[in-house]
Amino acid sequence: MGKITELKALFANLSKDANKLAQRLALSSRSLKGLKDPRFRKAFNELKSAGLIKIEKSLETKPTPLFGEKLRREIRRHLISDKAHFSKNFYRFYFAFIAPKIEQISEFSDKDKEQFLSSLKLERFFCLPFELVCADFLSHKLGVLRSSISSYWDKDCEIDILVQSSSFCLAAEVKYKEHIVSKKLLNELVAKCEKIGIKPDFYALFSKSGFSGELINLAKKSPKLLLFELNDFKDIL
């Protein structure tokens, strides 16, 4: 009960709208595209001022029309959307799982707490932290600035990690799943890169649960394909 009271006090100054928005961002795509309502823009600024969230800028750029050319209506109307990141994983965990049920949790017995914790869909929650750790790993492994690593998204596709240094480009996909990753993921990554018009020097795949034999054999033959599992992260621990 004491710890729940402490949590309530920690976020007591947040408005109802700010709490609602934080809960939405905690388990959503984190896109800020829908923040047209002045109330939610105010709530977003409140979360930002409180140091709870920060912005990841989109790498998407709008096409420049040629002289005399008129872009299609859907392209003209398309709004490039940034994304929100919680400044700490704890904040995201709190708003994803604790805040929506904080009043009930304060009355939980020990057994209720165990059942509540076992019911949480943590695999979905851990996808983003794992993706960020993979980006840190690549910064260390490749000797590039962390600021040169980001994710890419537009209205049609999303690439988990994109490294754009002065000497090379790398595109990567990250899977925090309980099953091995197959060549299908690589094919999808290659197709995404072709769609947005980039030609990476390297492709990287990260998997919590390993890779298919086909992918492993392919990586042995191609220096352009890099495969990373949990054991590879020992270097940065």
Task: Give each language-model segment a name.
Residues 2-154:
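Accessory nucleic acid-recognition modules appended to NTPase machines
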Residues 81-237:
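A cross-kingdom feature that marks ATP-driven nucleic-acid transaction machinery
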